[in-house]
């Protein structure tokens, strides 16, 4: 979010160009390919990170990068686009004309309106993270819900498949509820009723 805000404020600058390239690459690269490249570079060639299994913090670095790279790119692009649009609105120009500091204009007035669509995208992307975890868990040999679901499907254990899908649906429903509650904190005009 921070990179998107800065890129939106400094439209056309080096930071903006970097954020747009990052967003383009992040949305284009498949997490499976990224995970294989990270294993090849940091696990096999440089031998600085473990390639599979679970243990300490260092075992989580590559899977976290793989799962968060696309998520971060989408969020950065959405924030930047929203910030550029909001900063061109008339009320932002009027707020600046009143002599309010730039930082207050960005944080209090512009960011509040940018965050609503960003929170929506983040909520839907968290569901996508759950769905994509099966592939990442398989690549890094992590014993997680995603890999358990794949194993249950392959062994035709229907009760386990139904249970895992029910848990996943419940988690996604809770995430959507939290997104709706978060809306009321961002914009008090929105009510939960």
Task: Tell me the role of every PLM-derived stretch.
Residues 31-55:
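Extracellular/periplasmic helix-loop junction at the C-terminal end of a transmembrane helix
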Residues 2-38:
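Cytoplasmic-entry segments and transmembrane alpha-helices of multi-pass inner-membrane transporters
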Residues 1-15, 44, 54-193:
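Alpha-helical transmembrane segments of integral membrane proteins
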């Amino acid at each position: 979010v921070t990179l998107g805000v800065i890129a939106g404020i400094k439209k056309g600058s080096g930071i903006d160009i970097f954020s747009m390239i990052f967003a383009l690459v992040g949305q284009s690269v498949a997490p499976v390919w990224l995970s294989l490249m990270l294993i090849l570079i940091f696990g096999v060639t440089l031998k600085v990170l473990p390639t599979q299994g679970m243990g300490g913090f260092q075992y989580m670095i590559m899977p976290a990068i793989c799962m968060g790279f696309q998520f971060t790119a989408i969020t950065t692009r959405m924030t930047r686009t929203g910030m550029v649009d909001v900063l061109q609105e008339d009320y932002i120009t009027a707020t600046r004309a009143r002599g309010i500091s730039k930082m207050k204009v960005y944080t209090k007035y512009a960011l509040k309106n940018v965050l609503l669509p960003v929170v929506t995208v983040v909520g839907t992307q968290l569901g996508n993270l759950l769905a994509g975890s099966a592939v990442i868990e398989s690549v890094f040999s992590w014993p997680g819900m995603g890999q358990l679901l794949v194993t249950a499907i392959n062994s035709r254990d229907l009760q386990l498949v139904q249970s895992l899908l029910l848990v996943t649906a419940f988690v996604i429903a809770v995430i959507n509820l939290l997104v709706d509650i978060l809306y009321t904190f961002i914009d008090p005009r929105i009510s939960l009723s």
